[in-house]
């Protein structure tokens, strides 16, 4: 069992963020130590939501670490560049621990409107030296300075996933991360994940589910981290994470993407 310090937000509705991290990592046998970066009434895909920022993050971390040592650190949604800078300070003092970063900051080719250029720069510092990171295609482009629109011009080609893999073959050198999984690359009828580890570029693919549910990235990264901490290779952990997300999405009854994927009823797959 590993003690995992989790920096992420929590949402009342959305089945995402810490709402995904906690049950999945616990199911995989790890002790979760959440540091809430922000509390949302509903995830941001809903029209109306209320949010409260954690203005005492550094003090929260100090209180926790005075009583329990963290074996691993997970970084997710960090609200703004100032809060991410605080998290980076914790990371810089914890590089002897296993560091996992899900650099949540954009999708569909755009930086989320609540973030600015400084957030991207701070995230580049957060991923530097991380043991594993799990950006989506947009976030990978932001981290590596790749032109998303030019890359997406190849989307209709049957070799699109391989084109993306070639584009990011030097991603680890560029970002300073030790390994990476570029997640959720849509390729027609299937979804691909690009696994970058030890100089190799490998791929994991699954059938694409027609509804793009909220929180699938959080579910994926939770399984990925949990399995890595159990000693799985990056590739094997990616296989398990991708299969779990696919099965959970296929068995989700609610078709409103905002409520997220119904992963809890599939937790037995992690036994």
Positions of predicted regions on the chain:
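Conserved N-terminal subdomain of the carbohydrate kinase-like
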Residues: 2-101, 105-113, 267-270
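Glycine-rich beta-alpha junction loops
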Residues: 11, 38-40, 79, 105-107, ...
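Short pre-catalytic strand/loop immediately N-terminal to key active-site residues, enriched for Gly-Thr
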Residues: 12-13, 201-215
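Conserved phosphate/ATP/ADP-binding segment of small-molecule kinases
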Residues: 114-201
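Short, small-residue alpha-helix embedded
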Residues: 142, 211-240
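Charged C-terminal helix
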Residues: 235-271
